[in-house]
């Protein structure tokens, strides 16, 4: 029996549903989600394997006009996948008209010379007539291999999109073991789950100014719990105060919510200890970016 495999990048502007789509395909949380733009900062690999095929999805940071060194890293990280994949899923929202950000991405895709499938997400939010207008508009911008409307949140048409990808795959190797779902280490996934709760519970400038560093992660042989010590990094003292909250209430809530998700992922009881530290302007300092996991060599 022949086996098919290939690498597929998921590209698009911030907040179009790329991570929601990946998590739905994988059947579990691989990439964190929030309603904040630029939630995904690193390339996230999701490995979808059946008896007949393996699709290695690469969820990328939302492409935007960068204002910091972190933003530069995110955009470069997204575009670098064009050199690594067999197919690109270019995702746009059905409830927003094509904008400058979409046009910028389209120009890069035209030059990349890789097959592109246009994925119009959030179809549950629009009338069919509006969807048809969106399809016609994008069809006139470039020659897409396919145009597929979906709702990643509700799962509408997602399996059809996966089937289309399989049809376009060529025979190849199984690159990863069947039970492996991502290439990121557990420490990275743990840090992302903590950051997700910060994004969920805070507002304004806080989400963009936060990084999470896992200082230690080890099993206690007596209690059989996994002890995790994590530091939430911010850029200003005022941000530190907001995350800690009145009498530590906000930090406690972040820890409780994150611990539940981490326990589900690891399948073990977890003792999570969180601290908050200030590192001024870390998003514009390359050494800090590397220390906090935004390293071009790795992701």
Swiss-Prot record:
Q: Where does GTP bind?
A: 12-19, 59-63, 121-124
Q: List the disulfide bonds.
A: none
Membrane topology type, per the record? Peripheral membrane protein
**Could you tell me which residues belong to the region G1?**
12-19
Record region (G2): 38-42
Q: Which UniProt keywords apply?
A: Cell membrane, Cytoplasm, GTP-binding, Membrane, Nucleotide-binding, Ribosome biogenesis, RNA-binding, rRNA-binding
Query: What's an example GO BP annotation here?
Result: ribosomal small subunit assembly
- Return the annotated region ranges for G3: 59-62
The annotated modulation of its activity is: GTPase activity is inhibited by GDP but not by UTP, CTP, ATP, GMP or cGMP.
Query: Which Gene Ontology cellular-component terms appear in the entry?
Result: cytoplasm; cytosol; plasma membrane
Where does the UniProt annotation locate this protein?
A: Cytoplasm; Cell membrane
Kindly report the protein's main subcellular placement as a broad class. cytoplasm
Which stretches make up the Era-type G domain? 4-171
Please give the InterPro entries that the UniProt record associates with this protein.
G_ERA_dom, GTP-bd, GTPase_Era-like, KH_dom-like_a/b, KH_dom_type_2, KH_sf_prok-type, P-loop_NTPase, Small_GTP-bd
Function of the molecule: An essential GTPase that binds both GDP and GTP, with rapid nucleotide exchange. Plays a role in 16S rRNA processing and 30S ribosomal subunit biogenesis and possibly also in cell cycle regulation and energy metabolism. Has GTPase activity, binds both GDP and GTP, does not bind UTP, CTP or ATP.
Q: Which HAMAP family would you find in this protein's record?
A: GTPase_Era (MF_00367)
NCBIfam families for this protein: era, PRK00089.1, small_GTP
Q: What name does UniProt use for this protein?
A: GTPase Era
Q: Which organism is it from?
A: Streptococcus mutans serotype c (strain ATCC 700610 / UA159)
Q: Which gene encodes it?
A: era
